[in-house]
């Protein structure tokens, strides 16, 4: 079985960043070789700090009603109480998505571009849309390219280009 990994990269050209999802086979090229190769091509890896992760959450509540937050993992395993509260809020969002506001409030302590306290987020389609994606803070991406193109790229574009 051939499992391809995907990694999100940004490329700066004409005074703005563009984003691409690069697939790679870990049996053919190592992670470090991939990073090195793309650096030589003037691309940089996208790291998802907590601020970017929360911007993705806000996007599901404000601009993009096609996708919802299905799971979120805090990086520190010592903070079980916070993780349990987050899990409860996300569970409540299944019946009342307006609880996303509670989730954003619960995460306000880590809304920082120097924080990586949110280690992963899972986004799924709603209303019969079965697309799903999981994003790790190191920019590794599991999921549908449709979510990447239609949901994640617009958030990254606003965040990195100030649009």
Task: Describe the residue ranges of each PLM region.
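Intrinsically disordered, low-complexity, charge-rich terminal extensions
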Residues: 1-163
């Amino acid at each position: 079985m051939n499992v391809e990994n995907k990694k999100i990269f940004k490329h700066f050209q004409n005074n703005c960043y563009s984003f691409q999802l690069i697939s790679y086979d870990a049996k053919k090229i190592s992670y470090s070789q991939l990073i090195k190769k793309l650096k030589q091509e003037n691309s940089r890896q996208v790291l998802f700090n907590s601020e970017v992760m929360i911007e993705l959450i806000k996007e599901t509540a404000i601009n993009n009603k096609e996708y919802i937050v299905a799971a979120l993992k805090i990086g520190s395993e010592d903070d079980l109480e916070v993780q349990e509260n987050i899990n409860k809020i996300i569970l409540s969002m299944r019946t009342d998505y307006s609880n996303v506001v509670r989730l954003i409030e619960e995460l306000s302590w880590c809304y920082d571009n120097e924080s990586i306290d949110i280690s992963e987020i899972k986004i799924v389609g709603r209303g019969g849309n079965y697309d799903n994606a999981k994003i790790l803070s190191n920019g590794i991406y599991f999921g549908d390219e449709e979510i990447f193109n239609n949901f994640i790229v617009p958030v990254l574009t606003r965040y990195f280009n100030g649009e």
